[in-house]
């Protein structure tokens, strides 16, 4: 029996030394992912917006109202600049003369920015041609939003009715 205990003890001691002296073996797997540059985009309300109303008059006047939130999103990355522009068609009634786009002005108002963009509003007083309304410079992914006020000069003696125009935003 003593011999069995001695042999058993030797086996246990050998096994303990083997475990203590062994090195663990592992397998490391590198993992990566890719972020690709996105686009420069602009969004604006697509539903019709009422700028307000007033009584037709022998005196000229101005109608002003909020257009709704406009947002430029720049997902190009890096150091980039952009220019947001706007153009308007004439405000045309169902009957009678149109109120020309030269009577339409645009004020961007306060600009809310995210991350690393600096955006500056530029007053536009005549929307017959493409007019710059906000410029931006960023480092990285960014966005800028504003809620512009559209003002329309209404000449004296314009006929009562609903006047409609299309205001188009673009960014480059």
What are the functions of these language-model segments?
Residues 2-24:
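Secretory targeting and sorting signals
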Residues 6, 21-172:
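Signature of Gram-negative chaperone-usher
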């Amino acid at each position: 029996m003593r011999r069995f205990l001695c042999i058993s003890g030797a086996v246990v001691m050998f096994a303990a030394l083997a475990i203590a002296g062994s090195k663990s073996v592992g397998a490391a797997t590198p993992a990566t992912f890719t972020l690709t540059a996105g686009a420069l985009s602009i969004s604006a309300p697509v539903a019709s917006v009422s700028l307000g109303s007033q009584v037709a008059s022998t005196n000229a006047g101005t109608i002003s109202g909020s257009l709704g939130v406009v947002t430029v999103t720049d997902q190009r990355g890096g150091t980039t600049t952009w220019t947001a522009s706007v153009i308007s068609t004439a405000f045309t009634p169902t009957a009678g003369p149109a109120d020309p786009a030269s009577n339409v002005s645009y004020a961007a108002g306060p600009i809310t920015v995210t991350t690393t963009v600096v955006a500056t509003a530029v007053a536009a007083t005549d929307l017959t041609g493409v007019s710059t309304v906000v410029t931006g410079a960023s480092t990285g992914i960014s966005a800028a939003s504003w809620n512009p006020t559209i003002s329309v000069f209404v000449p004296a003696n314009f006929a009562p009715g609903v006047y409609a125009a299309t205001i188009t935003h673009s960014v480059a």
